[in-house]
């Protein structure tokens, strides 16, 4: 049970046994070691982003099936997630974008959390335009200053939720590049994607905040625009953070999470599958298609 999240911050909390079906629960309670069955429920938090949802539900499914432990999932905004894991309300989060995107959040809690490992590397973020926008007209942030470009883009950058690190960096980018005629449309991942879908379908110009890994790069032909001042940052890695006593309280789950490594190509394929089916089905397919990878994560615990 979470102790400090308010109803305004807490978006969704579910127990994986209910989410992923009775069969997994029966398997967990009857076919696995007694030690695992007696362990406390693992509480994992994630932000409402496609990559965070996929990797968190994947970790939850593996912990449930292989360790026989119940998993509770909490979806909320970024700031409450960092606060939750630092206070011990959450056992772990699998979406700490570093060294730039979440630098402010991490800096406030780094002495109160443990880093279990890096789940994937080579993550990146920036602003994108559709491939049908000529590169001769828009190649970099500087090109957005052109009056004719600003007019075609309606002076708007399609953004994501207010608490995202990318939102903070994008607001700073508007200042760094003196893009005074632009506004950042703060919304959500879903809102940004809806705006992109509408514009792309009608071949209208747009510029949007974006990050990779993300399934949108498989659905749409998009192009990053150059950021010569590095206002948005460069390549990032995504870490797993846990509360301070998690490794001693639940060494099996902590060890499993510390071994989780996902190649970006595999992650993007899984996220794409989730768009065609559901995250639960895509997670089940990922586990079936990557037995050696899962075996490495589980080690001697499963």
Give the ranges of each region predicted by the language model.
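Short helix-initiation/N-cap motifs at beta->coil->alpha
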Residues: 49-50, 72-84, 184-195
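A bilobed periplasmic-binding-protein/Venus flytrap-type ligand-binding module shared by bacterial periplasmic
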Residues: 125-135, 236-249
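Immediate post-signal peptide segment of exported/extracytoplasmic ligand-binding proteins
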Residues: 33-44, 146-154, 293-302
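N-terminal export leaders
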Residues: 12-16
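A ligand-binding cleft/hinge motif common to bilobed small-molecule-binding domains
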Residues: 94-109, 198-223
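A conserved helix-loop-strand patch within extracytoplasmic ligand-binding domains
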Residues: 111-160
């Amino acid at each position: 049970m979470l102790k400090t999240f308010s109803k305004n911050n807490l978006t969704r909390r579910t127990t994986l046994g209910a989410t992923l079906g009775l069969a997994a629960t029966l398997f967990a309670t009857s076919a696995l070691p007694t030690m695992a069955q007696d362990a406390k429920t693992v509480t994992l938090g994630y932000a409402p982003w496609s990559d965070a949802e996929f990797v968190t539900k994947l970790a939850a499914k593996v912990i449930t099936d292989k360790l026989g432990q119940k998993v509770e999932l909490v979806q909320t905004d970024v700031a409450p997630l960092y606060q939750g894991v630092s206070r011990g309300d959450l056992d772990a989060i699998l979406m700490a974008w570093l060294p730039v995107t979440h630098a402010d959040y991490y800096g406030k809690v780094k002495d109160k959390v443990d880093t279990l490992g890096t789940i994937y590397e080579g993550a990146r973020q920036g602003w994108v335009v559709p491939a049908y926008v000529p590169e001769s007209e828009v190649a970099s942030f500087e090109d957005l200053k052109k009056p004719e470009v600003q007019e075609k883009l309606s002076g708007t950058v399609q953004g994501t939720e207010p608490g995202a690190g990318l939102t903070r960096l994008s607001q700073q980018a508007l200042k760094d590049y003196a893009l005074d005629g632009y506004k950042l449309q703060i919304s959500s991942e879903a809102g940004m994607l809806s705006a992109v879908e509408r514009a792309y379908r009608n071949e209208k110009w747009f510029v949007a905040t974006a990050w990779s890994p993300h399934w949108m790069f498989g659905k749409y032909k998009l192009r990053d625009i150059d950021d010569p001042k590095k206002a948005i940052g460069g390549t990032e890695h995504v870490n797993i953070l846990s509360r301070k006593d998690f490794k001693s309280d639940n060494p099996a789950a902590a060890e499993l999470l510390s071994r989780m490594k996902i190649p970006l190509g595999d992650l993007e394929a899984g996220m794409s599958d989730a768009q065609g089916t559901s995250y639960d089905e895509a997670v089940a397919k990922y586990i079936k298609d990557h037995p050696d990878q899962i075996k490495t994560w589980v080690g001697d615990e499963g």
